[in-house]
């Protein structure tokens, strides 16, 4: 696919699609709650539609209208054995959180996914769940999907110190803890996104959060809710960077989620001298959201490491692109988690942007980016990773001559089916 190139002046306002993390969880909590849950501004992209499909297979009635998703909750105990394996496609969130949800059920389940899922590490979820009494294993006894879960296991409380900073692992343990006897205590390594914790409260449950320590009691019941999912800050990030690096641009992004565990990119943009303003922030059905305005800016290199990394882990590919247009060197470290995403994002970012003229050195846990470098035409690939594909389209906007051909552009539909249309809507 030929990408859009040689564009100046991205001007206008868009509303990015609903938050992917929250869309997944809204279906999950709607299913394990009792009564009806109504979800608006749900992300209708491949990953989240896969979560709907999985819960339908588990016997949950889910209706889809143009405006809403309506989940008729069954409670944990109302989930039924699927007729066959649950195929969750490309969604790491779905497989890992479902492992926690299904660990305490009284039926057996097999969960599988695409070739990318089959390469992603699952011991980080399986080991703590096994410690709680769950019985599960990967293919041929490995840690890789398909994952087989044996039902009718009695889950017990535990105290767990997380070896990695991962919201997916934390959430899987929380879902299992809700079905366990007693109180489970989780100690996070670093603060990660906390949508699961907030949704427990939104759906009428109880959870204690004190710094990096989380306490959750088993045996809780949830009640269906009405909710509006805010725009995904990870999707907004591509337009934030486009507005900062494309000459003559000013972009307004409306109804963007502003959960502080997700807004690390705002801090980095300001560190680099970028013009980013948040206005009209408000709480819509308990979720903080607002309008983000960015303008073309002169940028300088910076260092990105430590506890900010979990707050922007999914944005690092497009932050790396931003750094190619900043004066000086940008160093990103403590981000080894990027190697076990949909692809090895450290290598993918360096390889593809270097093809276009960037000066990026991959490291064991991050990237060293020397700016400012002009970008030129090249043939590039998404590696089947939605965030790499979208980042390369933003990079292509700066290419003045020739074509940028993207292999596997369809990956973008995992999280942002209307991405290319929204880019075109901002062109003068």
From Swiss-Prot:
PROSITE patterns: EPSP_SYNTHASE_1, EPSP_SYNTHASE_2. The active site is at 314 (proton acceptor). Disulfide bonds: none annotated. Keywords: Amino-acid biosynthesis, Aromatic amino acid biosynthesis, Cytoplasm, Transferase. GO terms for cellular component: cytoplasm. The keyword Protease does not apply. It is an enzyme of class 2 (transferase). It catalyses: 3-phosphoshikimate + phosphoenolpyruvate = 5-O-(1-carboxyvinyl)-3-phosphoshikimate + phosphate. Its main location: cytoplasm. InterPro entries: Enolpyruvate_Tfrase_dom, Enolpyruvate_Tfrase_sf, EPSP_synthase, EPSP_synthase_CS, RNA3'P_cycl/enolpyr_Trfase_a/b. It is found in: Cytoplasm. Pathway: Metabolic intermediate biosynthesis; chorismate biosynthesis; chorismate from D-erythrose 4-phosphate and phosphoenolpyruvate: step 6/7. Its EC number is 2.5.1.19. Catalyzes the transfer of the enolpyruvyl moiety of phosphoenolpyruvate (PEP) to the 5-hydroxyl of shikimate-3-phosphate (S3P) to produce enolpyruvyl shikimate-3-phosphate and inorganic phosphate. HAMAP family: EPSP_synth. Monomer. This is 3-phosphoshikimate 1-carboxyvinyltransferase.
